[in-house]
Amino acid sequence: STNPNVTVGSRGAYASGQAPIESPSAQNGFMIFDSDYYDNYGVAGGFGTGPYPSNPSGHVGTLTTESIDLSNYSAVSLVFNSYYREYTGIAKVAFSTDGGVTFADEMEVHPDIDVNDATTADYEVMLNLPPNVAGQPSVHIQFFYDGTVLYNSYYGYYFWMIDDIRLIETPANLFVCQDEMFGGWWKGYQTTGDLGCNYTFNPMAQALGNPYRLEGVVRNLGANAQNNVTLHGEIA
């Protein structure tokens, strides 16, 4: 059993009431670094009064694996469920190939999450291990919550929950499309007098002269290099 139990997420004053992570095996336990609670003990305005305060000088939390033999694998990916809300604390992963003495090749887990934003509770992360880490006979992986970044006079906050950590062989070909968006004039927007909202109807003549923008970020998570990648958009 755990205290608190697996039905409780963050207990911090500014993140309390958040549900726990919705990973496949959350009912048998998960890891949480509750930066909010550790700083204020669940009391609004109680900055620096918690059991492991982040204010006034910051705090750090780490979770490190035992040694893992990856000598037979040239391309490896780290996959896990992550529920993360950010104020100034940053979720990171680092790797060691010298028995856990030093950790390098640091990777930010959620670089797309801004201040006061959060992932979904069932978010799944996939990170490709650096080439100099895959293939090594002794690898330690460290999950690292960095609450030493100062923002708006405060350190840390809010929380990071992880569960169902596993290593897989990186698929040869795997694309992920993110940050998809459409709408808005990208040509002649200063003279059309139209906001280009995605619910707007326009005559074809105007649409041809002032086309919509369709864009996204395509990430290659596969082991193979990909060339001449083209993003297609379909309007129905």
Where are the regions that the model predicts?
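Surface-exposed, low-complexity/disordered Ser/Thr/Gly/Pro/Asn-rich loops and linkers
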Residues: T2-N72, F159-M161
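Extracellular acidic, Ser/Thr/Pro-rich low-complexity tracts
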Residues: S23, Y84-E86, V218-N224
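Extracellular carbohydrate recognition and processing domains
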Residues: T102-G135
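Extracellular/luminal regions of secreted and cell-surface proteins that mediate adhesion/ECM remodeling
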Residues: Y158-A236
